Amino acid sequence: MVAYWRQAGLSYIRYSQICAKAVRDALKTEFKANAEKTSGSNVKIVKVKKE
């Protein structure tokens, strides 16, 4: 048995992005602002100092 997202030709990451967007779009307006703030991704790059 193959997962539906695999049958559609999607990767799991893309499938989860689509699901998350659908959930955020279905939220009531009072909860939407908080969900939009947390939906972004943060990346921190740290350069290692050579001694």
Curated annotation (Swiss-Prot):
InterPro entries: ATP_synth_F1_esu_mt (IPR006721), ATP_synth_F1_esu_sf_mt (IPR036742). It holds the Pfam family ATP-synt_Eps. The modification N6-succinyllysine is found at residues 21, 32, 37. It is found in: Mitochondrion; Mitochondrion inner membrane. Its main location: mitochondrion. Keywords: Acetylation, ATP synthesis, CF(1), Disease variant, Hydrogen ion transport, Hydrolase, Ion transport, Membrane, Mitochondrion, Mitochondrion inner membrane, Primary mitochondrial disease, Transport. Transmembrane segments: none annotated. It comes from the Eukaryota. Signal peptide: none annotated. Ubiquitous. The keyword Transport applies. GO terms for biological process: proton motive force-driven ATP synthesis; proton motive force-driven mitochondrial ATP synthesis. One of its GO terms (cellular component) is mitochondrial matrix. The modification N6-acetyllysine is found at residues 21, 32, 37, 44. One of its GO terms (molecular function) is hydrolase activity. It is linked to Mitochondrial complex V deficiency, nuclear type 3: A mitochondrial disorder with heterogeneous clinical manifestations including dysmorphic features, psychomotor retardation, hypotonia, growth retardation, cardiomyopathy, enlarged liver, hypoplastic kidneys and elevated lactate levels in urine, plasma and cerebrospinal fluid. Belongs to the eukaryotic ATPase epsilon family. Component of the ATP synthase complex composed at least of ATP5F1A/subunit alpha, ATP5F1B/subunit beta, ATP5MC1/subunit c (homooctomer), MT-ATP6/subunit a, MT-ATP8/subunit 8, ATP5ME/subunit e, ATP5MF/subunit f, ATP5MG/subunit g, ATP5MK/subunit k, ATP5MJ/subunit j, ATP5F1C/subunit gamma, ATP5F1D/subunit delta, ATP5F1E/subunit epsilon, ATP5PF/subunit F6, ATP5PB/subunit b, ATP5PD/subunit d, ATP5PO/subunit OSCP. Subunit epsilon, of the mitochondrial membrane ATP synthase complex (F(1)F(0) ATP synthase or Complex V) that produces ATP from ADP in the presence of a proton gradient across the membrane which is generated by electron transport complexes of the respiratory chain. ATP synthase complex consist of a soluble F(1) head domain - the catalytic core - and a membrane F(1) domain - the membrane proton channel. These two domains are linked by a central stalk rotating inside the F(1) region and a stationary peripheral stalk. PANTHER family: ATP SYNTHASE EPSILON CHAIN, MITOCHONDRIAL, ATP SYNTHASE SUBUNIT EPSILON, MITOCHONDRIAL. This is ATP synthase F(1) complex subunit epsilon, mitochondrial. It comes from Homo sapiens. The gene is ATP5F1E.
